[in-house]
């Protein structure tokens, strides 16, 4: 039996089912998952739950064996609240550059560009 303290291998991870966060990379594009972007080797994993909002899946996660790929700070916050358990894996995620999600019509709007710059500056200070 595998120890809970040893990181899970990709082979072992692929035996489990995922709760996947889905999103579109651009308007009209097919949905992709955070799992597929962060861990390309896990692309073939079984998805038992797909959602566009990870918060809606948290209660399901806490009462199931589903695995969900989340940003580290989000996972830490949910784990500290006792809502999820963090499972270490041998695979390392692809480094992601954070992006703000904006509707394509507001992308060039000067006021929205200013709002994004304020958010970006604030995020760099923390």
Residue ranges and their predicted role:
Residues 1-5, 45-47:
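Acidic, proline/serine/threonine- and glycine-rich low-complexity intrinsically disordered segments
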Residues 8, 14-42, 72, 108-112, ...:
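Secondary-structure junction motif
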Residues 10-11, 39, 76, 90-92:
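Short secondary-structure boundary/capping segments
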Residues 13, 19-21, 66-67, 78:
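Conserved short hydrophobic patches within well-ordered secondary structure
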Residues 14-15, 62-64, 94-96:
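Residue-level preference for short coil/turn positions at secondary-structure junctions
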Residues 24-26, 67-74, 95-104:
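Short secondary-structure transition/capping segments
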